[in-house]
Amino acid sequence: MPRGRKSRRRRNAKAAEENRNNRKIQASEASKTPMAASVTPSTPEEYLSGPEEDTSTPEKASSTLAEASSTALVQKPVTRSNFQGTKKSLLMSILALIFIMGNSAKEALVWKVLGKLGMQPGRQHSIFGDPKKVVTEEFVRRGYLIYKPVPRSSPVEYEFFWGPRAHVESSKLKVMHFVARVRNRCSKDWPCNYDWDSDDDAEVEAILNSGARGSSAP
């Protein structure tokens, strides 16, 4: 075999060996990197982290949620492939609002929050069409939300609750994680009506230990 051909083979073999070594080094470094810092957000709640501001009232808390939710909804251009993810971000925002308000949220408050995101009932939205149909029909039909009149209200008001499918697919822990990331602090600092117990404290502690306190959207 000519010397030139042997020399090229040796160089190619050496380059291949260097590439393998580089990949091993990169894999080793990646394994040492905390998951929160190394993984691109892939679920609705992972896109949200809110600014530090006064949330001493439910109205201010919902305002912070609206601002953080807008980050999720405009994180990247909407295409066919990520439209469903955007809709999931909208749903998670509503579920979180219901949670922090004590397991139910009046329709007026929901639309006040969504109004800050440019969504009004009956008015066409560039992404969702009629947002009221998405929220009160699609999410209700699919079992994520319950939408019913407030007892003894006059004039009649409506309120939202978690639907059965939300309880199965979006556990309390997941929504507490969402809230913790929005506020970038322990979930129980929110001025909500939820009755905390020791199990909840343990869950929030686990969230904070997993990196929720220091996480932020990229």
From Swiss-Prot:
The entry's keywords: Phosphoprotein, Tumor antigen
Protein name: Melanoma-associated antigen H1
Basic residues bias spans: 1-13
Comp. bias (Low complexity): 61-71
Residue ranges of domain MAGE in the record: 1-197
Protein's GO biological process: negative regulation of transcription by RNA polymerase II; neurotrophin TRK receptor signaling pathway
PROSITE patterns, sorted: MAGE (PS50838)
Region feature Disordered, mapped onto this chain: 1-71
Extent of the signal sequence: none
CC per GO annotation: nucleus
Positions of post-translational Phosphotyrosine modification: Y194
